[in-house]
């Protein structure tokens, strides 16, 4: 899943509309449902739903600042996921 953690809604919309929507060839509304872009709590909600549906592995592709994004994911998202 594409990953970009940010609390800046404008930046999240920019990543969705200017980067991911064209790459995926899908409308922003559809892309928004299928990627982890935005605040950590929203990403936790999406991943918890996948986990509840039986998904056990998710591959992450940070769209920028790989090391920073993966560190944020480790610090802000993973601890909140159901075990």
Would you name each region that the model predicts?
Residues 1-7:
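Glycine-rich beta-alpha junction loops
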Residues 9-83:
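C-terminal amphipathic alpha-helical "assembly" element
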């Amino acid at each position: 899943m594409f990953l970009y953690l940010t609390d800046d809604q404008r930046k999240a919309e920019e990543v969705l509309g200017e980067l991911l929507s064209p790459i995926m060839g899908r409308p922003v509304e559809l892309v928004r449902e299928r990627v982890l872009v935005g605040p950590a709590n929203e990403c936790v909600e999406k991943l918890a739903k996948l986990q509840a549906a039986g998904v056990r592995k998710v591959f992450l592709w940070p769209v920028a600042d790989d090391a920073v994004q993966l560190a944020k994911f480790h610090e802000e998202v993973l601890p909140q996921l159901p075990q």
